[in-house]
From Swiss-Prot:
Membrane topology: Multi-pass membrane protein
Enzyme class: translocase
Localization per record: Cell inner membrane
Identification of the protein by name: NADH-quinone oxidoreductase subunit H
EC identifiers of the protein: 7.1.1.-
Function: NDH-1 shuttles electrons from NADH, via FMN and iron-sulfur (Fe-S) centers, to quinones in the respiratory chain. The immediate electron acceptor for the enzyme in this species is believed to be ubiquinone. Couples the redox reaction to proton translocation (for every two electrons transferred, four hydrogen ions are translocated across the cytoplasmic membrane), and thus conserves the redox energy in a proton gradient. This subunit may bind ubiquinone.
Reactions that this protein is recorded to catalyse: a quinone + NADH + 5 H(+)(in) = a quinol + NAD(+) + 4 H(+)(out)
Species of provenance: Anaplasma phagocytophilum (strain HZ)
Residue stretches spanning the membrane: 3-23, 69-89, 102-122, 127-147, 154-174, 186-206, 248-268, 274-294, 312-332
Gene: nuoH
């Protein structure tokens, strides 16, 4: 049964990636007073599959200076890690009563006790595929793009880790299912306490996924396409799929940490008749729209501004705010372990 769930999750992520690309092109076209994809299929709905077939049919060009196995291993590693992060994301849940106790049964492949640490570890491992791609391509542009991307991801992982720590402190658990349940039962003052961390997490999401306005690794005027400049055909497609799968993954993490997961946004009885999976997907969709909105409206940062924001603003602020949250929880005797 778990194998069926894994296959269904992989297929769902790949289809979601395909139509996220379609959504991005349509929304950006609307904001720029254009039509966007509208030829292949009704309203252009088959355009993602047309693009996939085009990439499959292209020749895989191997640069003369590339470094053999590493050149082909890099996109596979990046794509595999982008899918692996989804194993611990609870997409919904069913509540059952056993011996008079309400038990939450999440829709998740692996409900790990250390789910937060697992997601952080997967996001950290992704830098290996990127630096390998830049080194193995044998191109200075690709290598510089890879160095930029890796330094950017490492810089913002620090603040993201502190944000996740603050939410875990409030929830008293590192399991993502427990965090969603605890966040749903939290008082409003605790939501306000975590609100600045939500802002830090959203901006860090943009930097972690190399998305606009922090897409410095692929600055066209400087580095052409960045670390994947020498890739073509399905090798390029794997990097492309990995990037968009990561966009959906970090959006799902923000839904789990800050937006109540599969619970409805308002505690109104009639809203609970809508399946939790629908609420979860709706919240992820809203965050993905924000990704596209930012890309269409915000100018690109300079590299020094990006690094200054990560190391001199977000990291100190996140550290101080974790201390503030810990102090407040200590004052109200709500730190993990104090309730007993």
């Amino acid at each position: 049964m778990q194998l069926v769930g894994m296959v269904a999750l992989m297929v769902g992520v790949l289809v979601s990636v395909a139509y996220l690309v379609y959504m991005e092109r349509k929304v950006m076209a609307f904001m720029q007073l254009r039509h966007g994809p509208s030829v292949v299929g009704p309203w252009g709905l088959l355009q993602p599959f047309s693009d996939a077939l085009k990439l499959l049919a292209k020749e895989c060009i191997i640069p003369f200076k590339s470094r053999g196995w590493a050149f082909f291993a890099a996109p596979v590693i990046t794509f595999a890690l982008a899918l692996a992060g989804w194993a611990v994301i609870p997409l919904g849940a069913t509540e059952v009563i056993r011996d008079g106790v309400v038990v939450v049964m999440p829709y998740v492949v692996a409900d790990l006790n250390l789910g937060v640490l697992y997601v952080l570890a997967i996001s950290s491992l992704e830098v290996y595929g990127i630096i390998m791609a830049g080194w193995a391509s044998g191109s200075n542009y690709a290598f510089l793009g890879a160095i930029r991307s890796v330094s950017q991801m490492i810089s913002y992982e620090m603040s993201m880790g502190l944000v996740m720590l603050s939410v875990s402190l409030c929830a008293g658990s590192l399991r993502l299912t427990d965090i969603v349940v605890a966040r749903h039962a939290m008082p409003y003052w605790m939501d306000l306490l975590l609100l600045p961390m939500a802002g830090v997490f959203f901006v860090s999401m943009l930097a972690e996924t190399n998305r606009h306005p922090f897409d410095l690794p692929e600055a066209e005027s400087e580095l052409v396409s960045g670390y994947n400049v020498e890739y073509s055909s399905m090798s390029f497609a794997m990097f492309f799929l990995g990037e968009y799968a990561n966009m959906i993954l970090v959006s799902a993490m923000m839904v789990v940490l800050f937006l109540g997961g599969w619970y409805p946004p308002l505690n109104i009885h009639i809203l609970y008749y809508i399946p939790g999976f629908v609420w979860f997907c709706s919240k992820v969709f809203l965050l993905l729209f924000c990704f596209i909105w930012v890309r269409s409206t915000v100018p690109r940062y300079r590299y020094d501004q990006l690094m200054r924001l990560g190391w001199k603003v977000f990291l100190p602020f996140s550290f101080v705010w974790v201390m503030v949250i810990s102090g407040v929880l200590l004052w109200v005797k709500a730190l993990p372990g104090m309730q007993n």
